[in-house]
């Protein structure tokens, strides 16, 4: 299967990891990592979280394993994505394979309320 075309991978975002939470619930984020050649699409998909509650996704991030940069990114649930000043929280990480080789990731995200 061919990689996702660079013509479609038109967005750049910043990926943040939570490094601590204080006793009042304020979260501290790391300096962030810029991801380029990715795609963000609006979404209305409904999923179930780890507590079996229904959650409606706000957007899906597409990360191609060949064309997206940097190439050594590891996505985890609860990381934060900043796209054009709007923050999103990762809720699902779905690796998709071409035969036995990882082709791309589809990352389900909800709006992150603590801007």
Describe these PLM feature segments.
Residues 18-21, 26-115:
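Short, conserved turn/kink motifs that form compact alpha/beta structural patches or helix kinks used as
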Residues 1-27:
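Active-site-proximal polar cores
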